[in-house]
Amino acid sequence: MESVEIHGVKAKVARTFTERARGLIGMTKPPPGEGMLILRCNAIHTFFMSYPIDAVFFDRHDRVVKEVRGIKPWRFLVWGGWKAVKVLETASTF
């Protein structure tokens, strides 16, 4: 899986349907400064997560359109808004 740097975070890039649906689910908690960038995505869930996450939603110009911190496991839907096209998931810092 390809890695990129975005918003000061080294992130693995989820491109395929399976990678995007899974996100960080089932992965060990990433250390600070690492996460997953999910492309073609404007909403996430935290089913099956074992730790809280932070999510930063970006528009097509990589501008932040929404930031949500401390999303607990088993949350149904976190929506980034109509302009969001990708989301960066990291382990929560809160």
PLM regions with names:
Residues 1-94:
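Compact, glycine-rich, soluble single-domain proteins
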